[in-house]
Regions:
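Multi-pass alpha-helical transmembrane bundle typical of ion/small-solute transporters
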Residues: 1-357
Length: 357
């Protein structure tokens, strides 16, 4: 109970608030108990789907967050949720519609409330560009983990050793991604192919820019550390995590239209899920779960590569979000089981690593 209160208390409170808002909105918009119950049910289902399909997001977040100080960890949970809720679940789809329809923000809000079907059509119509941008960014996040010459722990041994080995080639992962994007673009009609490639390149550039900012901030922190000054900055990691969360959210926001085309209902449901993902991240960091299970990170990053690949392919093929989530869950489950098996077979090595940390 203490663990639940400590790590998930804020998320549970946030859930109560969102359900309260859903209750109020349901009664005011439908005027019936049945209509309100339907809205609340959709909110709950959306939140559960968001949580169940985002465990890989939480694991990857934890791998970054564990190196940030406590203050920035808290900011990720508080400030970051504002970006996740208002930025990705509300402003992002509204911005897509505003750009696609050439209308202003207020007109877009009115459209989402008065003509949800047209609002859904406009958001879904932007899927090719979203798939290119989000897929490229996520693919780079996953590839960067494995294209690392200093990586000495391997889960899928032969593949990971090979990727670690060829990382000596400059920008090998970028070349691989560009080739994949070019191949997928050949399957698309010409206008969509151009949109897809431009969006994918922008996703790649965004990843490089965020990595660059993080590196510059780390160098500045190192200078301060050498000078004996206190180092408290976690801005680079904070920016990286929020862009990563945005990339994870693209498919979820669009896929939510399968259950509802009401902007308010979608925002409430996905926001609850986003809050719990952040709480799961903090829980993983505080409990040191990544250190206890040596292959868990590997499973999460493989899941991200798969998610990025599926997102890129979704520009041409419809792939259910359920399938995507199941693949991620299977990879993480296998990596967890492999980690437990390793710990049982090599207890002395595990103890030595724990003492070394």
């Amino acid at each position: 109970m203490d663990t639940l209160k400590r790590f998930y208390g804020l998320s549970l409170l946030f859930t109560v608030v969102c359900l309260g808002l859903g209750l109020w909105y349901g009664m005011s918009s439908t005027g019936t108990v049945a209509g309100t119950a339907k809205i609340l049910w959709i909110i709950v289902v959306l939140s559960v789907l968001e949580i169940s399909l985002s465990f890989d997001n939480a694991v990857v977040n934890a791998s970054v967050l564990k190196d940030m100080d406590r203050a920035w960890q808290k900011r990720f949970l508080t400030w970051g949720i504002l970006f996740a809720v208002f930025g990705m679940r509300i402003v992002f789809p509204l911005a897509i519609v505003a750009i696609a329809a050439g209308i202003g923000p207020l007109e877009t809000v009115n459209l989402s409330l008065r003509d949800p079907a047209e609002y859904e059509r406009l958001v879904s119509g932007a899927h090719v560009g979203i798939a290119g941008f989000g897929g490229a960014f996520l693919a780079m996040v996953g590839l960067k983990f494995f294209f690392d010459s200093d990586k000495d722990v391997h889960w899928i041994d032969s593949i990971e050793r090979f990727l670690s080995g060829i990382s000596a080639l400059p920008a090998a992962e970028i070349a691989l991604l560009l080739l994949a994007m070019w191949g997928i673009s050949l399957l698309l009609p010409e206008p969509d192919a151009l949109t897809f490639l431009i969006a994918g390149i922008l996703g790649l550039v965004t990843f490089i820019a965020v990595e660059g900012v993080s590196t510059l901030l780390e160098l500045q922190e190192e200078k301060q550390r050498l000078a004996g000054a206190a180092v408290r900055s976690g801005l680079g990691g904070f920016l990286y995590l929020n862009i990563l969360d945005a990339s994870f959210s693209f498919d979820g926001v669009i896929g939510a239209f399968a259950l509802s085309n009401n902007m308010i209902v979608i925002a409430l449901g996905l926001s609850i899920g986003a809050m719990f993902v952040r709480s799961m991240t903090i829980h993983l960091v505080e409990k040191g779960t990544l250190a206890q299970y040596r292959y868990l990170e590997h499973g999460a990053f493989w899941a991200i590569i798969v998610l990025g690949g599926i997102m890129l392919l979704s520009a041409r093929f419809h792939i259910s979000e359920t399938i995507t989530g199941l693949i991620g869950a299977v990879l993480i489950g296998l990596s967890l089981w492999w980690s437990v098996r390793f710990n049982r077979r090599h207890p002395r090595m595990v103890d030595a690593e724990a003492q070394g940390d």
